[in-house]
């Protein structure tokens, strides 16, 4: 999907609510430094100072809309950033522009970091000739999930289930609580009715076969070493060819190619949201009639 079109997935009211909550977290009361800057009309340039994938424009826009500033973009969503890149310009009252600065930069750095990691993972997987889905997980930052899931999509990965309601996923603890794989899948099928798929986390071929026999749509082979993963997936597919197979647990950008194989449909990586390095952005004010520069001016 074109990254520019992904903004349509984000409800405007949700964007505004998130932006408002982030700004209130940073400034819940008085803003003393506003008396230093004043309210004169000002402009600043957003610079990208590290390579990666640009992601998070709708959230950036929403943050500055909350503080009465306007953003003009020079690069589209999903752009490959080559530092130092001039990404956007922000205009508005000085105290408002600086009120939104750090919140907007934090969000953009994090979202772009996730997108960059996702893009690297997808490129790595495709380089092996594998055509399955590279996915994130539900291992996201509380209160920041929408940003991170959106970043995955911009990077070309799939977001996996957005929340508990997107898929009935039976994990190891659910199996213990239900009294076994078959009982857990039966309960999951009742909960899923016709609208949701059921996925079961399995730690052995025996569990995987039991889950598929009980009616699971997908089987998650968790924490399998590659040399165990592929024979297990092949044996499962031989008996249940329509069951989807997901590999997860211990997958990194370095060892990802080892998990790609003809019987694996999905590979999910928690590190895409948990360990992706943030990109480096800065927002620099400049005086009317001067040339914007990406670093602090020297006197």
From Swiss-Prot:
GO cellular component: cytoplasm
Entry keyword Magnesium: no
EC number: 2.4.2.19
Gene Ontology MF: a single term: nicotinate-nucleotide diphosphorylase (carboxylating) activity
Pfam family, one: QRPTase_C
One biological process term in Gene Ontology: NAD biosynthetic process
Catalyzed reactions per annotation: nicotinate beta-D-ribonucleotide + CO2 + diphosphate = quinolinate + 5-phospho-alpha-D-ribose 1-diphosphate + 2 H(+)
Pathway where this protein functions: Cofactor biosynthesis; NAD(+) biosynthesis; nicotinate D-ribonucleotide from quinolinate: step 1/1
Keyword field: Glycosyltransferase, Nucleotide-binding, Pyridine nucleotide biosynthesis, Transferase
Binding site for quinolinate: 102, 138-139, 160-161, 171, 201, 222, 248-250, 270
Region of interest called Important for hexamer formation, as start-end residue ranges on this chain: 8-12
Enzyme class: transferase
InterPro entries in UniProt: Aldolase_TIM, NadC, NadC/ModD, Nicotinate_pribotase-like_C, Quinolinate_PRibosylTase_N_sf, Quinolinate_PRibosylTrfase_C, Quinolinate_PRibosylTrfase_N
Family of the protein in this entry: Belongs to the NadC/ModD family.
Subunit structure and binding partners: Hexamer formed by 3 homodimers.
Task of the protein: Involved in the catabolism of quinolinic acid (QA).
PANTHER family, per database record: NICOTINATE-NUCLEOTIDE PYROPHOSPHORYLASE [CARBOXYLATING] (PTHR32179:SF3)
Protein name: Nicotinate-nucleotide pyrophosphorylase [carboxylating]
């Amino acid at each position: 999907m074109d990254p520019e079109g992904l903004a349509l997935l984000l409800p405007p009211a949700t964007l505004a609510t998130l932006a408002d909550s982030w700004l209130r977290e940073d400034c819940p009361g008085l803003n003393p430094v506003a008396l230093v800057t004043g309210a004169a009309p000002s402009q600043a340039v957003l610079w990208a100072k590290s390579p990666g994938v640009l992601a998070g424009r709708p959230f950036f826009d929403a943050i500055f809309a909350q503080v009465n500033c306007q953003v003009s973009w020079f690069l589209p969503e999903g752009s490959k950033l080559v530092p130092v890149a001039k990404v956007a310009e922000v205009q508005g009252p000085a105290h408002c522009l600086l009120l939104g600065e750090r919140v907007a930069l934090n969000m953009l750095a994090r979202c772009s970091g996730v997108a960059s990691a996702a893009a690297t993972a997808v490129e790595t997987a495709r380089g092996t000739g594998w055509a399955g889905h590279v996915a994130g997980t539900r291992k996201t930052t509380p209160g920041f999930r929408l940003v991170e899931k959106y970043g995955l999509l911009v990077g070309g990965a799939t977001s996996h289930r957005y929340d508990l309601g997107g898929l009935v996923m039976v994990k190891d603890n659910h199996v213990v609580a239900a009294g076994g794989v078959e009982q857990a899948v039966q309960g999951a099928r009742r909960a899923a009715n016709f609208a949701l798929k059921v996925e079961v986390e399995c730690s052995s071929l025996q569990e995987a076969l039991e889950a598929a026999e009980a009616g699971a749509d997908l089987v998650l082979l968790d924490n399998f070493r590659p040399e165990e993963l592929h024979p297990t997936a092949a044996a499962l597919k031989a008996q249940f060819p329509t069951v989807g197979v997901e590999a997860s647990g211990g997958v990194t950008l370095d060892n990802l190619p080892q998990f790609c194989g003809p019987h694996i449909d999905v590979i999910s990586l928690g590190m895409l949201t948990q360990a992706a390095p943030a990109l480096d952005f800065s927002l620099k004010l400049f005086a009317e009639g001067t040339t914007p520069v990406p670093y602090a001016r020297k006197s």
